[in-house]
């Protein structure tokens, strides 16, 4: 398959690499239909990565179609449309079941595309560990483009606003209006905010937030 592979600062190449395959009965392979770029990918591109590895595939935001499953996968079947959250856990330990995947007790805690430990999703296909946990079916009526936002950016924004305990009638200030900040504005409205203040030095970003009803 073809993939984007990292070889050093400002050296990312679109080239061939081995097709992924399940490495255990609990894994799946997903054909990538859409992926996107994160600020973390840009850090890696500029040489501020999380590993000394080179030659690995980057990217951790993707949606696609299940094309292969291990015999132990129960919740998915070939042909399912799925979204792949960037963070990966075992799906069985207390931490994963509590939603704190970063504290996975079996050491599976990782993220696609940060090293060769788990190849990224800016490729034609990607291996999904613990697929019952780490691949989420796309609901009917949701486009793949919409689902892609849920793999990282919108989920991050929603989590942040929820942790801020925004209640109906709240006044909310969102500082920083990049993609996640803009989605935090939308999330605050959904949670019932009375007013949302949008703070950013970039006029174009403030204008986008104002289009969503925020006070710039």
Put a short name on every predicted segment:
Residues 12, 37, 91, 133, ...:
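Short alpha-helical
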Residues 92-175:
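NAD(P)H dinucleotide-binding glycine-rich loop of Rossmann-like/cofactor-binding domains
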Residues 18-35, 48-97, 139-141:
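Glycine-rich beta-strand-centered segment in the early N-terminal region that forms part
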Residues 7, 19-20, 53-59, 113-119, ...:
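Short Gly/Pro-enriched turn/cap motifs at secondary-structure boundaries
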Residues 140-216:
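Mid-domain Rossmann-like dinucleotide-binding core that forms the NAD(H)/NADP(H) cofactor-binding site
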Residues 40-46:
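Cytochrome P450 core scaffold surrounding the K-helix E-X-X-R motif
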Residues 11-19:
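Short glycine/threonine/proline-enriched tight-turn/helix- or strand-capping micro-motif at secondary-structure
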